Amino acid sequence: MSTPIKAVLFDFMGTCLDWHSSIVSALPSPIPQHVKSQFALDWRQMYFDANTARIKNSQPTENIDITHQTTLLQMLDKHPDIAPLFTPEVQARAIAAWHHQKAWPEVREAIRKLKEDHGWEVYVHANGTTRLQLNITRSAGLQFDMLFSSELLGSYKPAAENYLRVLELLKLRPEECVTVAAHAYDLRGAKAVDMKTVYVRRVTDDILEDQEVVRRENDAYVEDMRGLDEVIARL
């Protein structure tokens, strides 16, 4: 008999949030829409690369606003044709946009079902700062039992110590917890410490991952969060 689930831990951006629309809308209006879209995707990937480098070099966690500022400047170096449009005010607006995002349409109801219909604890567990997560939960209208940021935990996902610290704080065993994410690297980290995993496919994320490989790696693979509670109940 499988161990009953007690908690569901969500990655945030991409998994629960349509970060792409928020960032695209904050970029200078003269830039063509398709260029803004690709710029946002590349900026996001550069952020991931920066975090990976910090982990590899055993560096401490960094304020996500600083990382976004640094990577934005690197992006502008790669795009000298549009760089003049990014005045200091525009740069500040683009960075602030990461703090104000909308949830994917089905997410709010999915979280409600997990909490009310099943009685599971529901948490955010994601890289970033606590202030970022607080701002986004308000702008997206989402409610969680607790927000666990890399800033709070002192390490980035997918380092094992990040997941183990959350389990320690929650006083739960790995098999009692499910991680839900749109990022394969995150779920690989969760799986490495024996947590159960559900992958959510989002068009804005994991564009370089082989989805067939990702599907095989996880306990469940879903196209969105409709029926997520039923999927988790079967794990």
Briefly describe each language-model feature range.
Residues 3-22:
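Asp-based phosphoryl-transfer active-site loop
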Residues 61, 65-66, 83-124, 160:
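Short, acidic loop-to-helix structural element flanking the phosphoryl-transfer center
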Residues 11-14, 72, 124:
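Generic structural signal for small/hydrophobic residues in well-ordered secondary structure
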Residues 1-8, 112, 123-235:
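Asp-based, Mg2+/Mn2+-dependent phosphohydrolase catalytic module
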